[in-house]
Design a protein with these regions (language model features):
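Chalcogenol-based redox active-site neighborhoods
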Residues: 2-178
Length: 178
């Protein structure tokens, strides 16, 4: 009897969490949509807003946690590609639910030359359909959005592979220059 009760409770919790998570995916902006705005602190405590990137391409990548294996690889690949990305007229911002102190340590440890934005409550990740919300724990899904010079979503990369994400973005930007 207790086993069935526990199974029922567990099933209910799983369904509830699935429903909560499904809501954030419904917010996913598509190519051509205006990029959802944001006002977030970076690793240096400076407030960053979407509008400051008008006139350049913006690679906005969401990642689960600072200093975890996939996130380190993805960040280092963006770091190593900064010259090519800047030549293509692009800036890079990483966003996770970590605080700006964690971001500062992460950026310092790996010499990251771009902004890491602290989305502590996951609000911005939610507006980009990129939040995993399990109630007691939240983290960003590994999605990347390429925002054009006019502030519109140009390309969406979902569930990206950290080892390939940067190459896909660079290749896309090169096709625009050709």
């Amino acid at each position: 009897m207790i086993g069935w009760l526990l199974a029922g409770i567990l099933t209910g919790v799983v369904l509830l969490l699935w429903r909560i998570n499904a809501k954030t995916s419904a917010n996913l902006p598509k190519a051509g949509d205006p990029a959802p705005g944001f006002t977030l602190p970076d690793q240096n405590g400076n407030t960053r807003v979407l509008d400051e990137f008008q006139g350049k391409w913006l690679v906005l990548y969401f990642y689960p946690r600072d200093d975890t294996p996939g996130c380190v690889e993805q960040a280092m690949r963006f770091r190593n590609s900064m010259r090519d990305l800047e030549t293509a007229g692009a800036a890079v911002c990483g966003i996770s639910v970590d605080d700006n102190r964690s971001h500062a340590a992460f950026a310092r440890k790996y010499n990251l030359p771009f902004a890491l934005l602290a989305d502590r409550n996951g609000e911005v990740a939610g507006r980009y359909g990129s939040l995993r919300n399990f109630g007691f724990i939240k983290f960003a899904k590994r999605n990347t959005f390429l925002v054009d010079r006019q502030g519109r979503v140009a390309k969406v990369y979902l569930g990206v592979n950290p080892a390939r994400n940067t190459q896909y973005v660079s290749d896309y930007l090169k096709t625009l220059a050709a």
